[in-house]
């Protein structure tokens, strides 16, 4: 079911109204409390600016880290308020709590087009418990609710689900609208052929995605550490590579179900130890030496994967091809990132499905060349699995 978007609200709907926006400002800080990557803050700007330009009083709420219902000074959102003020070109009021009299007063003092940022929502135990009383307190300061935090949309928390029960209008922000358009679109009505690339170290964390994508896609390329569980299922020797022995039967059944849709690497780069300075060599997947572990896909596999991606209508990528944190074993991941960047230019819809793949395309410097980069980790996976996300379900239907 399509959801109502903030873009459906006009100046008449918004001017002078208090709008509570759940954003995802869970940004990394260094030891000095300086933000090292402000991507998530910048991603929320279109929604915030849309609201301020139409005269709304904007109240932002986010979590940072996992304080588990306690106040943790190193997880305060003060540096976020400072950075947001710079990006918006206006002073953002920073509250020292997320509910209570001082917060109510700060919001009452907001003028049209002004912005306040609440303190870390997870300092309050009611947030993660989805406590109705906490949700009611959050909603007391809002005429309209906007969810633009895709990264937490798969959680039924006070600020993502509970608050919608106490506000008349609940809509998706521009970022969530774009996520739904691309991720749901890729699964429900993709431009074909649809090729999916799934990587990462464990089959167990990607089972749901692999099963759903197998039904929907024309080809499924598998890389990363999980390939060794598939090889073992085929009776190959995998040396010292990572294997989930309890998932071998599952890998077998996925291969049977796939009816030739799954493409596995034919060669891998193996290492004598798990370290950036390990000795490395490329071997066939039928000749992995004892004691050596596969840490990347080989050059032949890269070629085969590139051919499979050539001319595809839609490509979805989730998970790296190898241990891309070590430069020696980042070759496969970087090659896929560059291939997808090139494919976008020739008309392929390229979707980077959250998590480590996002870090990979950023590392290679091709993030701006993709059609869509998802801001969710678990939320992206669950949407690609075809699951309903509580934070989305709770919004008003279009």
Swiss-Prot record:
Pathway: Carbohydrate degradation; glycolysis; pyruvate from D-glyceraldehyde 3-phosphate: step 2/5. InterPro entries: Phosphoglycerate_kinase (IPR001576), Phosphoglycerate_kinase_CS (IPR015911), Phosphoglycerate_kinase_N (IPR015824), Phosphoglycerate_kinase_sf (IPR036043). Its EC number is 2.7.2.3. Disulfide bonds: none annotated. Its main location: cytoplasm. GO terms for biological process: gluconeogenesis; glycolytic process. ATP binds at residues 206, 294, 325, 354-357. The keyword Kinase applies. It comes from the Bacteria. It holds the Pfam family PGK. It is found in: Cytoplasm. Substrate binds at residues 24-26, 40, 63-66, 122, 155. It is an enzyme of class 2 (transferase). GO terms for cellular component: cytosol. GO terms for molecular function: ADP binding; ATP binding; phosphoglycerate kinase activity. It catalyses: (2R)-3-phosphoglycerate + ATP = (2R)-3-phospho-glyceroyl phosphate + ADP. Monomer. This is Phosphoglycerate kinase. It comes from Picosynechococcus sp. (strain ATCC 27264 / PCC 7002 / PR-6).
């Amino acid at each position: 079911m399509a959801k109502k978007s903030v873009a459906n609200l006009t100046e008449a709907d918004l001017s002078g109204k208090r709008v509570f926006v759940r954003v995802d400002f869970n940004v990394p800080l260094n030891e000095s409390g300086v933000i090292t990557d402000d991507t998530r803050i910048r991603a929320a700007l279109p929604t915030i600016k849309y609201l301020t330009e139409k005269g709304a009083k904007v109240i932002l709420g986010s979590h940072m880290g996992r304080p588990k219902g306690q106040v943790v000074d190193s997880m305060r959102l003060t540096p976020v308020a400072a950075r947001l003020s710079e990006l918006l070109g206006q002073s953002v009021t920073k509250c020292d709590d997320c509910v209570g009299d001082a917060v109510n007063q700060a919001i009452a003092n907001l003028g049209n087009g002004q912005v306040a940022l609440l303190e870390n929502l997870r300092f309050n135990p009611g947030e993660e418990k989805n406590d109705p009383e906490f949700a009611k307190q959050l909603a007391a300061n809002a005429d309209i609710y906007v969810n633009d935090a895709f990264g937490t949309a798969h959680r039924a928390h006070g600020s993502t689900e509970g608050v919608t029960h106490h506000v008349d209008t609940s809509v998706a922000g521009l970022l969530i609208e774009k996520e739904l358009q691309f991720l749901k679109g890729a699964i429900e009505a993709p431009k074909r052929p649809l090729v999916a690339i799934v990587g990462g170290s464990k089959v167990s964390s990607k089972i749901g995605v692999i099963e759903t994508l197998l039904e929907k896609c024309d080809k499924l390329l598998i890389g990363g550490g999980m390939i060794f569980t598939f090889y073992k299922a085929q009776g190959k020797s995998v040396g010292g590579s990572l294997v989930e022995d309890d998932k071998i039967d599952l890998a077998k059944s996925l291969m049977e179900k796939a009816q030739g849709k799954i493409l596995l690497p034919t060669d891998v780069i193996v290492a004598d130890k798990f370290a950036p300075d390990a000795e490395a060599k490329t071997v066939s997947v039928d000749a992995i030496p004892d004691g050596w572990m596969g840490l990347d896909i080989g050059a032949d596999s890269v070629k085969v994967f590139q051919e499979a991606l050539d001319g595809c209508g839609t490509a979805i990528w989730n998970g790296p091809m190898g241990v891309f944190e070590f430069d020696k074993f980042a070759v496969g991941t970087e090659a896929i990132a560059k291939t997808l960047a090139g494919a976008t230019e020739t008309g392929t819809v390229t979707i980077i499905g959250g998590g480590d793949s996002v870090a990979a395309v950023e590392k290679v410097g091709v993030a701006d060349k993709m059609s869509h980069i998802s801001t969710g980790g678990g939320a992206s996976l669950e949407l690609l699995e075809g699951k309903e996300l509580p934070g989305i379900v709770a919004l008003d239907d279009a």
